[in-house]
Amino acid sequence: TLLSKVPFYPQQEYFCGPTTLSEVAAYYGVDHSADSIAGLTFTPGLQGSPQIEMAAASRQLGFVAYEQRGSLSQLLQLIDEKIPVIVLQNNGLSWLPQWHYAVVIGYDLDRREIILHSGLTAEYRLPLATFEQTWQRANYWLLAMLPPERTSALLDPFLYTRACQDLLQTRQT
């Protein structure tokens, strides 16, 4: 399963957050460059984008920012529903983290791989076991950016309702 219509943009250094937001927004027909989004998310002192800023930027772009601690099963089911998902990974060690955002765009269960737009690589294939380790070290965080008219039965109703309320409070709809 592959969401081939999710565009890939090579990321600039430390811009994995804005780049993933730009890719998913473009998938839904909303074009914003990573540079323009970086003004909403990027924290120079951290050399990156905190999760709270990722969700806030999603709302500023007009999307429901559905965040949760996910599971591999849920992630694959969201892909089956043609919903690309932003994940946070720790590609370093627990005591020396290397945080990185990527967009999950597919999977191949026969080859036991997850497919990501990540960094400078489009359709990067990563063994599921490796992905689960890096995602686990980031507490299985996921962000599904959804247009306000889109939902999924896979999403926790309470968290989804809260995400919709957060969007309404930004007055972006």
Residue ranges of predicted features:
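Active-site-adjacent substructure of cysteine-protease-like catalytic cores
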Residues: 64, 68-117
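Extracytoplasmic/periplasmic, Sec-exported soluble proteins
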Residues: 8-17, 29, 43-50, 63, ...
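Noncatalytic regulatory segments and standalone regulatory/sensor domains
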Residues: 108-173
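Active-site-adjacent structural segments surrounding the nucleophilic cysteine of cysteine proteases
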Residues: 1-48, 91-92, 110, 156-165
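Extracytoplasmic/secreted envelope proteins and their assembly/folding machinery
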Residues: 13, 17-25, 34, 38, ...
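Short, solvent-exposed, low-complexity loop/linker segments
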Residues: 31, 35-39, 43-47, 51-81
